[in-house]
């Protein structure tokens, strides 16, 4: 009995010691990002998650600007927000691939306190079937476009004085945490945001700017409906292991994470497991979450291997079935 008590006491002391150490070393510290009376600028804000985030920001008293390519969709988004809240938002039409156009829109909108880089495009195909133009399109919009938006906004965001902590958020995807069949180019464009966010946080933390990386799962947006029709069958089978969520649910979780100044924001348990499995050198502002990563990282790696085993078994069965169907047609 004494041995069991000693082991238990050692475990408790170990956890307490680890918590004390982590409370000193986790960086950057989490802060609360104020929203009321502040300027929130959202790219890809005319539909889907971006529009839902705009609704939330307006409802919490922010001055909101949204940017997208389509003037028609921007007008619809502006009307929907005004009907729901009675507040008028500013709209800007620009292609994020065009740095000059983005820079002009951001300059016209005024100094930004909370920047949400949300634009994204997806063309689901195996790489062999994807054209170089399609690959370039996704990389240019999802990754290069994010660089353009942030670079254009940074000078004024850094020049802010006495306005409290600021935020730059990038909307990635669970495909930016784990590569998925049929998402070759898309995953590459979203994985790139991880490196962008990690390095950017180091560059802007001394200016009081906190970076947040958002990892939504499949979300029932208009774009997702089109994606389901076009993406490979095997992609849908594998992606189903994570499940999907409603747009407003995702927007609430993401917006709460932005306000809490978190670096990594996930939307459900599978996403949380993926965040720990892929955390690498990501900053962690919460010593409680840091403790979870340290204590359970190995077990979560085991869980990720189980997922990989399931995915590869699925690919193997699907491939064998397809070969049989092809052979039967040729016979």
UniProtKB/Swiss-Prot annotation:
Pathway assigned in UniProt: Lipid metabolism; sphingolipid metabolism
UniProt-annotated location(s): Endoplasmic reticulum membrane
Distribution of this protein across tissues and organs: Expressed in roots, leaves, stems and flowers.
Reaction catalysed by this enzyme: sphinganine + NADP(+) = 3-oxosphinganine + NADPH + H(+)
Keyword flag Lipid biosynthesis: no
Residue positions binding NADPH: 44, 46-48, 69, 73, 95
EC number(s) stated in the UniProt entry for this protein: 1.1.1.102
Motif extent (GXSXG): 44-48
Keywords, comma-separated and alphabetical: Endoplasmic reticulum, Lipid metabolism, Membrane, NADP, Nucleotide-binding, Oxidoreductase, Sphingolipid metabolism, Transmembrane, Transmembrane helix
Coiled-coil portions: none
PROSITE patterns given in the database record: ADH_SHORT (PS00061)
Null mutant phenotype: No visible phenotype under normal growth conditions, but the double mutants tsc10a and tsc10b are not viable.
GO molecular function annotation: 3-dehydrosphinganine reductase activity; NADPH binding
CDD domains documented for this protein: KDSR-like_SDR_c
Any Gene Ontology CC annotation: endoplasmic reticulum membrane
Topological domains, Lumenal: 1-7, 284-286
Catalytic residues (UniProt): 172, 186, 190
Topology in the lipid bilayer: Multi-pass membrane protein
Swiss-Prot/TrEMBL GO biological process terms: 3-keto-sphinganine metabolic process; sphingolipid biosynthetic process
Function: Catalyzes the reduction of 3'-oxosphinganine (3-ketodihydrosphingosine/KDS) to sphinganine (dihydrosphingosine/DHS), the second step of de novo sphingolipid biosynthesis. In plants, sphingolipids seems to play a critical role in mineral ion homeostasis, most likely through their involvement in the ion transport functionalities of membrane systems in the root. Is stereospecific for D-erythro-DHS production and does not produce L-threo-DHS.
Protein name per UniProt: 3-dehydrosphinganine reductase TSC10B
Source organism of this protein record: Arabidopsis thaliana
């Amino acid at each position: 009995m004494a041995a069991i008590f000693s082991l238990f006491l050692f475990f408790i002391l170990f956890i307490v010691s680890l918590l004390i150490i982590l409370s000193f070393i986790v960086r950057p510290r989490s802060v609360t990002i104020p929203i009321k009376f502040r300027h929130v600028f959202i790219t890809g804000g005319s539909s889907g998650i971006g529009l839902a985030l705009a609704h939330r920001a307006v409802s919490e008293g922010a001055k909101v600007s949204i940017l997208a390519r389509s003037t028609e969709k921007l007008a619809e988004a502006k009307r929907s927000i005004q009907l729901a809240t009675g507040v008028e938002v500013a709209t800007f039409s620009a292609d994020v691939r065009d740095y000059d156009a983005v820079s002009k829109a951001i300059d016209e909108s005024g100094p930004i306190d909370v920047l949400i880089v949300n634009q994204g495009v997806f063309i689901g195909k195996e790489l062999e079937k994807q054209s170089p133009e399609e690959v370039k399109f996704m990389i240019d919009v999802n990754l290069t476009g994010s660089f353009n938006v942030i670079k254009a906004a940074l000078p004024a965001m850094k020049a802010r004085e006495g306005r409290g902590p600021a935020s730059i958020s990038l909307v990635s995807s669970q495909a930016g945490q784990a590569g998925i069949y049929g998402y070759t180019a898309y995953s590459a464009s979203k994985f790139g945001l991880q490196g962008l966010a990690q390095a950017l946080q180091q560059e802007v933390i001394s200016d009081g700017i906190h970076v947040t990386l958002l990892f939504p799962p499949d979300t029932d947006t208009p774009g997702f409906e089109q994606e389901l029709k076009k993406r490979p069958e095997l992609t849908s089978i594998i992606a189903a292991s994570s499940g999907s969520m409603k747009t407003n649910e995702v927007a609430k979780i993401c917006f709460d994470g932005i306000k809490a100044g978190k670096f990594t924001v996930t939307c459900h348990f599978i996403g949380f497991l993926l965040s720990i499995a892929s955390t690498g050198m990501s900053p962690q502002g919460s010593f409680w979450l840091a403790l979870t990563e340290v204590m359970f990282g190995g077990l979560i790696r085991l869980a990720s291997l189980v997922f990989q085993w399931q995915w590869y078994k699925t690919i193997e069965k699907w491939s064998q079935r397809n070969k049989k169907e092809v052979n039967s047609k040729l016979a």
